[in-house]
Amino acid sequence: MSPSATVFDIGGNAVGTLQLVGHLFDSDPNLHLIHQVVVAQQAAFRQGTHKTKSRAEVSGSGRKPFRQKGTGNARCGSTRAPQMRGGGVVHGPVPRNYVHRTPKKMIKAALAGCLTNRARAGRVHIVDSFGDTPSVADALTLFQITGLSSKLLVVAQASDSVAYRSVRNIPGVRLVHVGQLNSYDVLRSDDVLFTRGAYNVFVGPSGDLAFSEDRDNPGTSLPKSPTPEDSSDATKARSSRHDDRTGA
């Protein structure tokens, strides 16, 4: 049986329990996969704008500092050589992209594994809503009564401004939209708190839309793929327009 989550109201009172969707909250976590996805996500955070100047880019003359022979010094052909003061850097960092290629299936499986870990430990919770008006005091009361950790991840819908304004200034609490839920944020938080609306959007009507491209609009669908008949009609239309232009 898949884990369950306690449902709270804004006052911190338990109003029921909800059986979590099995393939999202009761999967088989793959630690190596989770590590790979989190490392890729952290790498994507890097700006990659680091830059040093080579001997061809530093300012100043590249003249020969002293004659080739007779000084007792090692021969040197430029004042901008790497060993000279003011010289260029050898093999220094240059701007680059740190993004790792991470297939969507890996991202989905890693997130399901992280949520499974939290759900089995009883650290996935659901709140009906954060009320009709934003209130930091009500949010703090909810967290204290329910015993939620100070390292808390709140998952809400993108349109839920009440939740955002209620928790945005509380230390240790991070709020993400349901479409932004990711393995890294789940792992760095001890507890995960879904609003009921966000949970319904995340799992979808039958638990199949959890990782759709537009989780805040689960009713949207991709354009219908063209059928062979459609392709044939389009070809005939193009041919007809060509004949009209050529006068055939």
Swiss-Prot record:
TM ranges are: none
Q: In terms of domain of life, where is this protein from? A: Bacteria
InterPro entries named among the record's database cross-references: Ribosomal_uL4 (IPR002136), Ribosomal_uL4-like (IPR013005), Ribosomal_uL4_dom_sf (IPR023574)
Q: Which GO cellular component terms, listed alphabetically, does the Swiss-Prot or TrEMBL entry include?
A: ribonucleoprotein complex; ribosome
- GO molecular function terms attached to this record: rRNA binding; structural constituent of ribosome
UniProt entry keywords in alphabetical sequence: Ribonucleoprotein, Ribosomal protein, RNA-binding, rRNA-binding
Q: Compositional bias (Basic and acidic residues) spans?
A: 233-248
Query: Where does the signal peptide begin and end?
Result: none
Q: Name one GO biological process term.
A: translation
Q: Where is this region: Disordered?
A: 48-96, 210-248
What NCBIfam families does the record tag this protein with? rplD_bact
Q: Which family does it belong to?
A: Belongs to the universal ribosomal protein uL4 family.
Q: Kindly state the subunit structure of this protein.
A: Part of the 50S ribosomal subunit.
**What is this protein's function?**
One of the primary rRNA binding proteins, this protein initially binds near the 5'-end of the 23S rRNA. It is important during the early stages of 50S assembly. It makes multiple contacts with different domains of the 23S rRNA in the assembled 50S subunit and ribosome. Forms part of the polypeptide exit tunnel.
Which protein are we looking at?
A: Large ribosomal subunit protein uL4
Q: Which gene encodes it?
A: rplD
